[in-house]
């Protein structure tokens, strides 16, 4: 079955190409739920079984998923449901019962099948994912991302923000409601806040999957450095490279706000900044989705996000799958901005500072 290759998918863009760190799942639709069709459902299950068997990040788990799906299909477990969404939810629950994965899911009618224009990593081209940005206080810059869609609108907004706030003494990045996406926006930021080339995280993908479906990375991208890895695995290190013309942000204190809704690519950002000690993470442990992959159609009217790779700390070999990235300063998510401002030497509360954002 065909996949679209992405890097990390976002909650705002639940239909993401296959190497996106997918985001937390979106509801299939706010409209009436599509009717259940037995033939369509059975075709979706057959194609999903093949997809996970051939592509899932852990081959043994992929085989176990496939065996379960085929056994359930044979005994008629997917023969009748009140609607298509109930069927998709049941299949997702069955998958998670075999092996938990924060991204793996079957869903109904993703955006790409409804004809919505997609950015290279699955986000609508005209949506600016910078929710808020500006000065919270003299010298204290703030930017709030809903996701990392990798589109032109968001890239332009990030460029403007970095230029306008290049002399900030403190930078607060709010990822508390960031469901993920791609690497583009964080690479823009990394280029300004790191003062030397720095290894961030390591990303593994099954060699057979990359050969069959391609790679979400530009082979010549200096930010995705190919390194030696285990047999059957293609390993890359994501690195930060300072921009040729850097701003004062390379010396700024950086604070990253997190919550349990911080997911996927936003967790990639979290681990990268925590591991390198380039930022202080404030808030809650993140959502726990460390596997990247992509969305592929399953039969008629269904699609599945199938994880094909994992992102992890090169120092420990451990990812944040199922556990999340722990903050440096643990506070409830709604108090994270207050704490960041306090550490930045600002006496105002987060609520009052946001009302005067400029």
Predicted features along the sequence, with ranges:
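Short, basic, helix/turn surface patches
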Residues: 203-204, 305-319
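Extended C-terminal subregions enriched in glycine
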Residues: 253-271, 280-287
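C-terminal soluble interaction/assembly domains
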Residues: 274, 281-299, 304-306, 318, ...
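Mature extracellular/periplasmic domains of secretome proteins
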Residues: 240-246, 271-272
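Gram-negative bacterial Sec-dependent N-terminal signal peptides
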Residues: 1-21
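Flexible, low-complexity junctional segments that flank or bridge functional domains
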Residues: 21-226, 233-238, 253, 268, ...
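Short, conserved helix/loop micro-motifs enriched in His/Cys and acidic residues
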Residues: 243-257, 298
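Low-complexity, Gly/Ser/Thr/Pro-rich intrinsically disordered linker/tail segments
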Residues: 318-358
């Amino acid at each position: 079955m065909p996949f679209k290759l992405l890097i990390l998918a976002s909650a705002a863009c639940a239909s993401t190409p296959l190497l996106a760190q997918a985001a937390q799942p979106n509801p299939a639709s706010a409209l009436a739920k599509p009717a259940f069709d037995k033939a369509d459902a059975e075709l979706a299950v057959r194609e999903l079984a093949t997809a996970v068997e051939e592509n899932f990040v852990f081959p043994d788990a992929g085989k176990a998923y496939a065996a379960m799906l085929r056994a359930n299909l044979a005994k008629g477990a997917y023969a009748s449901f009140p609607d298509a969404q109930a069927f998709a939810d049941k299949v997702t629950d069955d998958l998670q019962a075999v092996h938990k994965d924060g991204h793996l899911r079957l869903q109904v009618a993703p955006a790409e099948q409804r004809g919505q224009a997609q950015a290279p990593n699955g986000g609508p081209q005209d949506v600016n994912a910078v929710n808020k940005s500006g000065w919270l206080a003299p010298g204290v810059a703030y930017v709030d991302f809903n996701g990392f869609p990798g589109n032109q609108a968001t890239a332009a907004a990030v460029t403007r923000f970095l230029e306008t706030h290049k002399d900030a003494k403190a930078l607060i990045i709010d990822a508390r409601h960031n469901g993920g996406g791609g690497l583009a926006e964080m690479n823009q930021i990394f280029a300004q806040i790191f003062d030397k080339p720095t290894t961030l995280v390591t990303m593994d993908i099954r060699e057979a999957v990359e050969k069959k479906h391609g790679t979400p990375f530009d082979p010549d991208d200096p930010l995705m450095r190919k390194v030696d890895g285990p047999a059957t695995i293609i390993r890359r290190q994501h690195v930060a490279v300072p921009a040729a013309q850097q701003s004062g942000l390379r010396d700024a204190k950086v604070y990253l706000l997190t919550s349990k809704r911080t997911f996927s690519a936003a967790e990639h950002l979290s681990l990268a900044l925590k591991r390198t000690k380039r930022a202080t993470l404030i808030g809650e442990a993140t959502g726990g989705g460390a596997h990247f992959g992509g969305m592929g159609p399953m039969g008629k009217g269904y699609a599945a996000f199938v994880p094909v790779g994992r992102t992890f700390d090169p120092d420990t070999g451990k990812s944040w799958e199922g556990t999340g990235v722990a903050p440096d300063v643990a506070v409830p998510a709604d108090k994270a901005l207050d704490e960041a401002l306090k550490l930045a030497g600002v006496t105002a509360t987060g609520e009052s500072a946001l009302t005067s954002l400029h």
